[in-house]
């Protein structure tokens, strides 16, 4: 086999990348624009509720860890 035939696939790796046009790539992923006038209140509520729950749990766990640290090291 000729050396040029072996190197031919590697030249494709060295070629500059070609990006698809913006309009063709958008049409693949966005069928329609989401409605911005009416937010999905269920998702908003679940997101905020989860965030509040996690912060409360984090603070509670931190306080328990601080008390355990003080107890083990005789600082209390």
Swiss-Prot record:
Transmembrane region(s): 41-59
PANTHER family, alphabetized: NADH DEHYDROGENASE [UBIQUINONE] 1 SUBUNIT C1, MITOCHONDRIAL, NADH-UBIQUINONE OXIDOREDUCTASE KFYI SUBUNIT
Predominant place of localization: mitochondrion
Family according to the record: Belongs to the complex I NDUFC1 subunit family.
General function of this protein: Accessory subunit of the mitochondrial membrane respiratory chain NADH dehydrogenase (Complex I), that is believed not to be involved in catalysis. Complex I functions in the transfer of electrons from NADH to the respiratory chain. The immediate electron acceptor for the enzyme is believed to be ubiquinone.
High-level lineage: Eukaryota, Metazoa, Chordata, Craniata, Vertebrata
Membrane-topology annotation of the record: Single-pass membrane protein
Gene Ontology CC: mitochondrial inner membrane; mitochondrion; respiratory chain complex I
Locations listed in the record: Mitochondrion inner membrane
Designated name of the protein: NADH dehydrogenase [ubiquinone] 1 subunit C1, mitochondrial
Keywords of the record: Electron transport, Membrane, Mitochondrion, Mitochondrion inner membrane, Respiratory chain, Transit peptide, Transmembrane, Transmembrane helix, Transport
Complexes and interactors: Complex I is composed of 45 different subunits.
Span of chain positions assigned to the transit peptide in the UniProt entry: 1-27
